[in-house]
Amino acid sequence: MLIFKICFYRLLPLSVLLLAACSALKAPESSSVLKNHIASDEWQEYQHQLKQIQQFQIQGSVAYFSDEKKAYARFFWQQYSPKNYHLLLLSPLGQTEFELKVTNGRVDMAKYKDQGEIKGDAEEILFKLTGIPIPLEHLSRWIVGASSDADEIILNRQSRLKTLIHHKKEQTWKVYYQAYNTKITPILPERLELYLISPNHQDQRMTLKINHWILK
């Protein structure tokens, strides 16, 4: 596995960069939403290219905002197959704060600092440790710009995703694609904003900045 020399900032509440409450969050409004979109040939071809991406490595940064708190971190993600991946979070000194390995959709190993292995669902484990509801089940497809699990989509002028909306139980995820990396083939997302809208009105937002892509 390629090892990146990265400094990672701890996620909330890993005792680093806990800031004051931020202002109320509002997702950008869209003028039109495409349901059951009958896509152009260009869009269909692009999605076909994305489906071929089964393995990748990315490194980048994440910023998290809610009504009460905000946090910043850097991450490393290695995707081996659709249901197999490895996630690392490290301290500024390069020490492993959190490590997660998922095999066939199940947690194979989860470690937090020196507390040993942790059992449970991947999303539940990460939420308990960080307080951030990261949608790991869908994130690997959203990261590459695939719309396979979308309920509603909006395309940009280049026939790539501009907005993706996914409904899960009483929650709604809205993903806004703000920038793409045009130096790689196929062109892949470089900056995303994810909004979680839930009935308790505790709206939450994450910004993902992908600094480096490796495709296999």
Swiss-Prot record:
GO cellular component, one term: cell outer membrane
Taxonomic superkingdom: Bacteria
Location(s) in or outside the cell: Cell outer membrane
InterPro entries, alphabetized: LolA/LolB/LppX, OM_lipoprot_LolB
Membrane topology per record: Lipid-anchor
Residues with lipidation of kind S-diacylglycerol cysteine: 22
Alphabetical list of PROSITE patterns matching this protein: PROKAR_LIPOPROTEIN
Signal peptide: 1-21
Keyword flag Cytoplasm: no
Keywords: Cell outer membrane, Chaperone, Lipoprotein, Membrane, Palmitate, Protein transport, Signal, Transport
Lipid moiety-binding region (N-palmitoyl cysteine): 22
Keyword Protein transport belongs to the record: yes
GO BP annotations listed: lipoprotein localization to outer membrane; protein transport
Subunit record text: Monomer.
Family per similarity comment: Belongs to the LolB family.
Function, in words: Plays a critical role in the incorporation of lipoproteins in the outer membrane after they are released by the LolA protein.
Protein name: Outer-membrane lipoprotein LolB
The organism's taxonomic lineage, starting at the top: Bacteria, Pseudomonadati, Pseudomonadota, Gammaproteobacteria, Enterobacterales
Gene name of the encoded protein: lolB
